[in-house]
Amino acid sequence: MDAILKASLPKLREKLLEALQAVLPIVAIVLVLCFTIAPVSPSILLCFLLGAVLIVVGIMFFTLGAEMSMTPMGERVGAVLTRSRKLPVILGVGFLLGFLITISEPDLQVLANQVPSIPNQTLIFSVAAGVGLFLTVAFLRMLLGVALPPLLVAFYGLVFVLAAFVPREFLAVAFDSGGVTTGPMTVPFIMALGVGVSAIRGDRHAADDSFGLVALCSVGPILAVLILGIAFRASDSTYIPPVLPEVSDSVELWQLFHEGLPEYIKEIASSLLPIVVMFGVFQAVALRLDKRTLGRIAVGLAYTYVGLVLSLTGANVGFMPAGNYLGQVLAGCGMPWVIIPIGMLIGYFIVKAEPAVYVLNKQVEEVTDGAISAQAMGMALSAGVSISVGLAMVRVLTGISILWFLIPGYAVAIGISFVVPKLFTAIAFDAGGVASGPMTATFLLPLAQGACVAVGGNIVTDAFGVVAMVAMTPLITVQLMGLAAQLKTGRRRAARAAEPALAGVAAYADWPDDDIIEL
């Protein structure tokens, strides 16, 4: 165990630098706003800065912990499931995994508290059942080699048909639920499951199908909340604003975070427990890993736990009040439109601070053998989230229904999916769920809520939906990146095909078609 801890120290330093690069731009933007057009109280600023420190340290531990534990656990469980060749076992365990992991997702508790017209347990269990059901659908797709785009057309078509019968107050929350439930606890494990299942297949399309699980799992919660929206009255939906902190000295500042810490210690422990228990069962029955591997996974789980506790404490206690207050000040400064470009700037950088984004980017780079670099993936996500936040702020200022954005957005995203390589489509729809994590829920959503309060809008219908918007635009930007790569590859092949003709060496008419058009 000591050797494992010592070996992880250089990696921790590397992860610390990555975390600083992700969080410092957000801190810089907020500080510039605080000292210029959006003055805030010292209490809120100090809470924000201490929250930023906790988030940096938390991301450092979480990203390394996920590499050491969540990813290998998911890959091994997925491989064992597929190797069993028993479809009822694969689907049954898949449903159970999806259900248990979702119940333990911390962000789902936050969503449930924002929808008082539906009992918390009813909402949580319905959403968890939706994720479990669609995880089994995702497993079936991978095992049978079914293309992702037709499934997306069918399921999102059903979503928008149901949306026509749901009260307006439920629409934004329903679409938010799809992004909220694919958070830092769910994503690493589910993505690793996909890699494990596809690795056993071993055919030429296995890498393409290793992504797409998060994409399908995001549909389940949306359908669940829409169905609940038809069954429950929306008149009781209310918005509970976050309490703005007031501290007079450093001791009170620490006490504020110290009071929130036990809650997140308990939340994350209950979140990790189902995954650990499930892995323990697999270890006893089928895996039987050696002690060194188990020791590495145990250290990784400890890092994951510490990282998530620190990140969520910093985000909820430090970032959430700051986001809400900044939104109120910016939208109430006499030039409310200024929140649109500022929101876009914050959105561009804040996605880099999402813990699960690191897992996605790294896995994409590994599965594609570097064809899609983590840097390129990060830029596509940042561009998508920036556009999302800008559109969300337009909604806050105008009160336009979220469907005017989501229906065209998903139509474009699904339309593109039929012309880009399958791998890019699966990655793009996974990226949408990954980008809308805890940083979106604890900073961007409060920013929109604060702005909505300042302009006198309806919080439930106009401010909610930020998570849904953030989950939508990466579907388009990542696929456009794939389309650009496809066109670039096509031009290179065309240039290579033209060289013999230009040199008068050989006739290209006899070349096999596959050499010319296969991408």
Walk through the language-model features, giving the residues of each:
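Transmembrane helix-loop boundary segments of multi-pass membrane transporters
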Residues: 46-47, 65, 112-124, 142-157, ...
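Structural signature of hydrophobic alpha-helical transmembrane segments
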Residues: 48-60, 117-129, 176-190, 242-243, ...
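Small-residue-rich segments of transmembrane alpha-helices in multi-pass membrane proteins
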Residues: 26-30, 58, 86-94, 154-165, ...
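Hydrophobic alpha-helical transmembrane segments in multi-pass integral membrane proteins
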Residues: 165-173, 225-233, 311-318, 390-391, ...
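Transmembrane alpha-helix boundary signature
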Residues: 39, 62-73, 99-111, 168-170, ...
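Signature of multi-pass transmembrane helix bundles
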Residues: 1-64, 79-80, 178, 191, ...
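Alpha-helical transmembrane segments
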Residues: 135, 139-145, 170-171, 195-209, ...
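Helix-loop-helix junctions within the multi-pass membrane cores of secondary transporters/permeases
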Residues: 78-79, 87-158, 336-417
